[in-house]
Each structure stands twice: as structure tokens, then as C-alpha cells.
Amino acid sequence: MKKLLLALFTLAATIGSASAQVEIGLKVSPSITSLRAESTSKNSFASDGSQFGFSGGLVVDYFFGENYAFSTGLELAGKGGSIRYTDYLNSGVGNGNPFPVSMKISTQYLQIPLTVKLFTNEIAPATRLYFQVGGSLNVPIGTRINGNKFYNDPVTGTENKAGDYIYFFDADALVAAGAEYTLGKSTKLFAGLGYHRGLVDIDHYFESKRGFSDVTIKNSSFGLDLGIKF
């Protein structure tokens, strides 16, 4: 019995020590998002404008040193933008009459950051800077094109779900920097700037369904990170 109590006490002490190294909080990030689009000159895919996005969710910082932390969490992130391209009345093979097409794509992602945060020593009372680098894994959960859940291809006349245009997975490179201010024993406020650069071609329609050549569409977003940790 004594050994069991000692083991439980040791386990509780270990958990308490470990929990002191973990900071959990909430974050919101208003952002400007866009799509980087390109293709061969026949279809001339290009970005056609940015849009306002918003993300927010849970932040978890696990410290493995006084100034170093593995940072992850779970966020809901809005991304997208407008793209333009040239289509043809004979289903895009390039011999018919060309005409321009523009479409606005908005996608909601579940996003899991996988990053390292580096903190400076205090640069002012209760204030230190942080630098964050890594990436994120993203799964789309909803897409709209021109504000609608369905989209009619202007050449084929086929109606598809907007989500059919988007690949089922995305991954970003992520860099961020900001400042963190300690309010009390464990409460901290932070603010910073972050840039997500998509690494995965999210086109799931133009090459596979329309036979376009070398189409690439990738996400980008630049945002303001605001949050609190407890």
C-alpha cells in the first residue's frame, strides 16, 4: 500500500512538473489571403486578387527549455482568393474562341500548426519577443466558389460541388514573429505577424477533369496573430 501511494505521489508530481511546461491558450488571426496560380500560356492561370480571411483556435506551447517551445494547436482557418484563366469554347483544347474566366475560391480548413518558437530574454518588464518557424497540416472542410457551394463550368456546363475543385490536403510553411507580455503568474498576452505559404498544389479539377496542362494553385496568407495563454 505504501509503495502504491508512493508511486501515485511520484506520478502526480511528475504530471504537475510536466504541466508547468505546457501553456495553453486561444488565438485569433485576421488575415489577407490569396491564391498563387500559374499554368502554360495556353490557359494563362494567374492570381486575380486577395480576400479577407479569419482563423482562430487553440494554441499549445510545450517548453523543452526556458526559451524554446514546440508550438501546435488546432485552428479553423479561412483561405482563398480570386484567380483568372483563359478558356476555349471547344472545352479548352486551345483551338476555339478564347475567353477570360475569373472565379473567387474560399475554403475553410482545419489547421494543425507544427512549429518551434524561440523566445528572447525580457526586453522590457514582463515582455519578450518570439520567433516562430515550421509548418502546418491543413484539411479542407468547406469550399465556396463565387459565394456558392456549387459551380457551373462555363464551357462544359457541368455543375460540380465547389469542394470538388480543391485537393483533400494542404500543407504550409509558416514563419511568424511577435511579442509576449506576462500579466500575472500564468496569464500571457501575445501579438505578432505570421505568413503561411502553401506548399501543395490544391487544384483538383482543371488538370484531372478538364485536361489543362501544368496548372498549379497554391494558398498564401499574411495575418495578425492575437491571443492569450493561461
Predicted regions span which residues?
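Residues on the lipid-exposed face of transmembrane beta-strands in outer-membrane beta-barrel proteins
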Residues: 26-30, 54-62, 66, 74-76, ...
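Predominantly the C-terminal beta-signal and adjacent terminal strand-loop region
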Residues: 170-175, 179-230
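Hydrophobic, well-structured mid-protein blocks that either form specific transmembrane helices
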Residues: 94-135
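Bacterial Sec-dependent N-terminal signal peptides
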Residues: 1-27, 226-230
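Short glycine/proline- and aromatic-enriched beta-strand/turn motifs that initiate or cap beta-hairpins
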Residues: 20-59, 229
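Extracellular/periplasm-exposed beta-strand and loop segments of Gram-negative cell-envelope proteins
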Residues: 34-51, 79-110, 139-170, 201-223
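Short loop/turn motifs that connect adjacent beta-strands in outer-membrane beta-barrel proteins
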Residues: 19-21, 66-67, 121-128, 183-188
